[in-house]
């Protein structure tokens, strides 16, 4: 079969909503992140340390990161890493539409927009060196869930895929947990043909899959590190996640899940000039709860125990949708909370079942009024989703534009300092140029853009193509710290005064106004 015929056959076989979600997600991603894909950006405080990155993060428990990062180059090239990230999210969107059996093409497109523009994706793009690996991992985890749902013997491949995904980024396990919760709520509310026993069996299957996947993750981690206590660092408590200490802290961490959830559904944008409050999120959640209750009444009838179980799950939703606190209790940020997108997906699957709900309400007393209210609520929920997607997109691009300004500022600083070094009569071609101190230039993205000697060094080496003798930024940092303790450095003037540039040892040193070590 020719390639064009095979592709055409594949397109015909894929359900229209799945295809629509995948294609629209890719298009939305290209439009939303076009500026980031076509500009040189350093979005995170540590990005300058990772201009060259081989994906090896075994030291923080991410044993599969190097494999998934190998699809792109070892340099932070946004038009490669970012494009792979967008492809992964597009595939992920189509898979979730299949898992949730969304029938409406419109809602499939809306779900893909939510998944592509959610703040976790733009935050992931900020880590250019492994943005592709992070989202490829989320895609593999979603593929595991798809196999678990669609194939009778899908448990084993699902366990392996989720374990591999968790080995790239631990938050993938909680992302799958969040999507499982969305599917469970959908079946409990919208599917009267799925009885209580079937729901319990499915919940048990979900729990078994996650327990086995996380266990396999730790088994492989121990095997690859030799089981040594010092082989894995305690970054984000990865070594404590399976400990008795973490289990004992469950009540405190459970409360933390609720705090993290409400923070994640807080203001849509806090950037100056494009602030957007939290009202779209709160209105959407309120209408979502209303639609869940009315849909249950219409589709399930009088099932008080099942209704109470649904209310209990609604109360536990912040845990299931933001459970990363259980695995990383020290700190939670948007990079870890992709599972919170399930908040919006629950509303979308309820809207997808709205035709059946309205049909059932016709035969109920006061059903017509309730039906009109639900129809109006669906329009309001769609409007909230549009506002959310738009605000997330604008917020991301404002950050990208500020990052571009940061880059230009870095370039200007380094070019100035390099010119000072080369103008010094003691400068010899190939001498490392050490900028020691603090330029007092602070980015609004968490850390100063140029806050340590290794940042200047790395920028000069990789961005200005200066021939530097060291391969890593940490090596030059260690040498800078030794030079800082010398008498020659202490007696130097500070920039921009005369005498702020001097050869010390085999390095050309520029002393700034402040020292941060």
List where the protein language model places each region.
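Intrinsically disordered, polar/acidic, low-complexity terminal segments
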Residues: 2-59, 63, 69-89, 99-112, ...
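Membrane-interface micro-motifs in multi-pass membrane enzymes
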Residues: 58, 62, 85-87, 106-149, ...
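Transmembrane alpha-helical segments of multipass membrane enzymes and assembly factors
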Residues: 94-109, 149-152, 298-302
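Transmembrane alpha-helix segments characteristic
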Residues: 112-116, 301-326, 388
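Membrane-interface transmembrane helices that cradle and orient dolichyl/undecaprenyl
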Residues: 141-155, 187-194
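Membrane-interface alpha helices of multi-pass inner-membrane proteins
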Residues: 154-171, 175-176, 181
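Perimembrane helix-loop-helix junctions
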Residues: 175-211
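Hydrophobic, aromatic-rich transmembrane alpha-helices
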Residues: 263-266, 270-308
